[in-house]
């Protein structure tokens, strides 16, 4: 996993470097469609779970911080059969991208039935 994260970081850094002055006009979001359970399974891996992570990069990202909280790995802090707790819904992050970077306020059409709450990860602007 550490090697894969290093590869991702190096790839994102190269992408950012290649953009030169245009990097400030771009917002990059990396995310997974699933998280991983905290406990190892019978195959020495981990099953799909709830909690995951997202990375944001770009000129309008309020950087240098972690945008969620860490509830911990104790049994009483896990959800169900060993899932990490979700502390920031991915739709809130993507809703903020829609609002502040795409200038699209139609969040009720993009995320039907979800009351999106921007979390202050981005500044507005082109």
Predicted regions and their residues:
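Feature marks hydrolase-like catalytic cores characterized by long aromatic- and Gly/Pro-rich stretches
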Residues: 1-126
């Amino acid at each position: 996993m550490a090697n894969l994260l290093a590869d991702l970081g190096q790839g994102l850094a190269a992408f950012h470097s290649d953009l030169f002055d245009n990097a400030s006009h771009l917002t990059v979001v990396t995310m997974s469609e699933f998280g991983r359970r905290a406990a190892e399974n019978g195959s020495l891996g981990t099953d799909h779970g709830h909690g995951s992570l997202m990375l944001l990069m770009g000129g309008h990202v309020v950087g240098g911080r972690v945008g969620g909280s860490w509830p911990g790995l104790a049994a009483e802090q896990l959800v169900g059969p060993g899932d990490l707790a979700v502390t920031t819904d991915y739709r809130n992050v993507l809703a903020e991208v829609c609002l502040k970077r795409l200038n699209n306020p139609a969040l009720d059409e993009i995320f039907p039935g979800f009351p999106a709450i921007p979390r202050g990860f981005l500044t507005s602007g082109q």
